[in-house]
UniProtKB/Swiss-Prot annotation:
Presence of the UniProt keyword Transcription in the record: no
Name this protein carries in UniProt: Melanocortin receptor 4
InterPro entries (UniProt xref): GPCR_Rhodpsn (IPR000276), GPCR_Rhodpsn_7TM (IPR017452), MC3-5R (IPR001908), Mcort_rcpt_4 (IPR000155), Melcrt_ACTH_rcpt (IPR001671)
One Gene Ontology biological process: adenylate cyclase-activating G protein-coupled receptor signaling pathway
Transmembrane segments: 44-69, 82-106, 124-145, 166-186, 192-215, 249-271, 281-304
Function of the molecule: Hormone receptor that acts as a key component of the leptin-melanocortin pathway at the intersection of homeostatic maintenance of energetic state. Plays a role in regulating food intake: activation by a stimulating hormone such as anorexigenic alpha-melanocyte stimulating hormone (alpha-MSH) inhibits appetite, whereas binding to a natural antagonist like Agouti-related protein/AGRP promotes appetite. G-protein-coupled receptor that activates conventional Galphas signaling leading to induction of anorexogenic signaling in the hypothalamus to result in negative energy balance.
Cytoplasmic face of the membrane: 70-81, 146-165, 216-248, 305-332
Length: 332
């Protein structure tokens, strides 16, 4: 794992570190030394400062989301609790990647006696990243299930998704993902671990896609049924659909940002010596940047899609330190 960092390689997990280390040797064997010394098959270098900067931005943004949800009682609903879980996962993924940049720098600059300790720290960070990835996927799936219940079981929703039940679900998600993440790193020498992670990723996406196909095919029918009920049923149903659309955007961004990373893993398993696969895998650092961008983009989506959350952001950022600035800005 140490040798894989000499060309500025910043790997996000121990098994990915190992795969990137083999990248150049595979290119050399199959394509000749001239190809591996430069061009498409040379590892793309990204400055460590970029990783650290994105990590800090993600940390501040997602802390803001967590504080806003905790502060505003109007946001104490199942969907926002799951969003809070997603924000924690995003924050840990991005901050851990930024922290690993520092660890890798220390790994390359310290002597042999201290490298073993640094490697152990790196493995702990890898476990956090892997656990957070799994928690992100599970949190997105939980939000999808929550939106499904709000649309198809609107009248029974509050009996089904109680706050206590949501807290238990989130606790179980993080407990299971933490154990799984640690096991993935412990047994990272096996290709079966990568295959398992890829399978989990696409299985979760398939489940969410199935829920959404059903939701959007039947949503209009349920809106018509709710509309004939007294009170504000139609308004509530419209808000539920808005939440479903918000999650659609979140899932879309998640897929765009994470798909290249998982495609890298698929190529590493299936065609590690194919010239096109090697060329794609040489941009691994770029895929890590995309992953961190996902953690930066998600809080912006929350703010754009939720007026209540946006209002709370404004109160936290402006009103406390700057007094009446929020009152002034609200007039315009």
């Amino acid at each position: 794992m140490v040798n894989s960092t000499h060309r500025g390689m910043h790997a996000s997990l121990h098994l990915w570190n190992r795969s990137s280390h083999r990248l150049h040797s595979n290119a050399s064997e199959s394509l000749g030394k001239g190809y591996s010394d430069g061009g498409c098959y040379e590892q793309l270098f990204v400055s460590p400062e970029v990783f650290v900067t994105l990590g800090v931005i993600s940390l501040l943004e997602n802390i803001l989301v967590i504080v806003a949800i905790a502060k505003n009682k109007n946001l104490h609903s199942p969907m926002y609790f799951f969003i809070c879980s997603l924000a924690v996962a995003d924050m840990l993924v991005s901050v851990s990647n930024g922290s690993e940049t520092i660890v890798i720098t220390l790994l390359n600059s310290t002597d042999t006696d201290t490298q073993s300790f640094t490697v152990n720290i790196d493995n702990v960070i890898d476990s956090v990243i892997c656990s957070s990835l799994l928690a992100s996927i599970c949190s997105l799936l939980s939000i999808a299930v929550d939106r499904y219940f709000t649309i198809f079981y609107a009248l029974q929703y509050h009996n089904i998704m109680t706050v206590k039940r949501v807290r238990i679900i989130i606790s179980c998600i993080w407990a299971a993902c933490t154990v799984s993440g640690i096991l993935f790193i412990i047994y990272s020498d096996s290709s079966a671990v990568i295959i398992c992670l890829i399978t989990m990723f696409f299985t979760m996406l398939a489940l969410m896609a199935s829920l959404y196909v059903h939701m959007f095919l039947m949503a209009r029918l349920h809106i018509k049924r709710i509309a004939v009920l007294p009170g504000t049923g139609a308004i509530r149903q419209g808000a539920n659909m808005k939440g479903a659309i918000t999650l659609t955007i979140l899932i879309g961004v998640f897929v765009v940002c994470w798909a290249p990373f998982f495609l890298h893993l698929i190529f590493y398993i299936s065609c590690p010596q194919n010239p096109y696969c090697v060329c794609f895998m040489s941009h691994f650092n770029l895929y890590l940047i995309l992953i961190m961008c996902n953690s930066v983009i998600d809080p912006l989506i929350y703010a754009l899609r939720s007026q209540e959350l946006r209002k709370t952001f404004k109160e936290i950022i402006c009103c406390y330190p700057l007094g009446g600035l929020c009152d002034l800005s609200s007039r315009y």
